[in-house]
């Protein structure tokens, strides 16, 4: 059996988990998230913990038990604590400004780059060179951060661009004659 799938998911106070034939829904202070139920995984809710077991002994069922367990765990953590990604802008004149559900970037192009935030995602700019993305859905937070980073990824010679706050950019040496 999958090692990840063997671990139960603890449900904290204030989080409600609803399991139906079609989907698994998690509701908490951060909102409501749901994932499609998989026929290869049996879910048992006892004593405030969810256990995930493969429905049969196939490799696919074993793999899906770990996958569904981690998706449900991410939903439980998301609706209770939330997820956040931090981005830094490095470069002369590079700046970001968040206004409501919009993010405006000035990153060296002849035009500003605008992003509309999807529902359930908030963005803040504590400083003009720092972006903080928060939300309950881990996948959407990470995907939005990746899309913003893709506007101007860090270049290898000077390190200018948009990078994750914990990202290390290896600087290359320039060619010598």
From Swiss-Prot:
The keyword Ribonucleoprotein applies. The keyword Ribonucleoprotein applies. Pfam families: Ribosomal_L6. InterPro entries: Ribosomal_uL6-like, Ribosomal_uL6-like_a/b-dom_sf, Ribosomal_uL6_a/b-dom, Ribosomal_uL6_bac-type, Ribosomal_uL6_CS. GO terms for cellular component: cytosolic large ribosomal subunit. GO terms for molecular function: rRNA binding; structural constituent of ribosome. Keywords: Ribonucleoprotein, Ribosomal protein, RNA-binding, rRNA-binding. It comes from the Bacteria. Disulfide bonds: none annotated. GO terms for biological process: cytoplasmic translation. Belongs to the universal ribosomal protein uL6 family. This protein binds to the 23S rRNA, and is important in its secondary structure. It is located near the subunit interface in the base of the L7/L12 stalk, and near the tRNA binding site of the peptidyltransferase center. Part of the 50S ribosomal subunit. PANTHER family: 60S/50S RIBOSOMAL PROTEIN L6/L9 (PTHR11655), LARGE RIBOSOMAL SUBUNIT PROTEIN UL6M (PTHR11655:SF14). This is Large ribosomal subunit protein uL6.
């Amino acid at each position: 059996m999958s090692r990840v799938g063997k671990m139960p998911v603890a449900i904290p106070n204030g989080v409600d988990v609803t399991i139906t034939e079609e989907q698994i829904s998690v509701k908490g202070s951060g909102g409501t998230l749901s994932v499609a139920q998989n026929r290869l995984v049996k879910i048992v809710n006892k004593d405030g913990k969810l256990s995930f077991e493969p429905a049969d002994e196939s490799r696919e069922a074993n793999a899906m038990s770990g996958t569904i367990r981690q998706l449900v765990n991410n939903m439980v953590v998301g609706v209770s604590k939330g997820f956040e990604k931090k981005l830094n802008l490095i470069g002369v004149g590079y700046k970001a400004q968040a206004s409501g559900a919009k993010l405006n970037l000035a990153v060296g192009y002849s035009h500003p780059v605008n992003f509309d935030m999807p529902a359930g995602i908030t963005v803040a700019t504590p400083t003009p060179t720092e972006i903080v993305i928060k939300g309950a859905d881990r996948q959407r937070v990470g995907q939005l951060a990746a899309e913003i980073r893709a506007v101007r990824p860090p270049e290898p010679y000077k390190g200018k661009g948009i990078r994750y706050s914990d990202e290390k950019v290896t600087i290359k040496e320039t060619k010598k004659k």
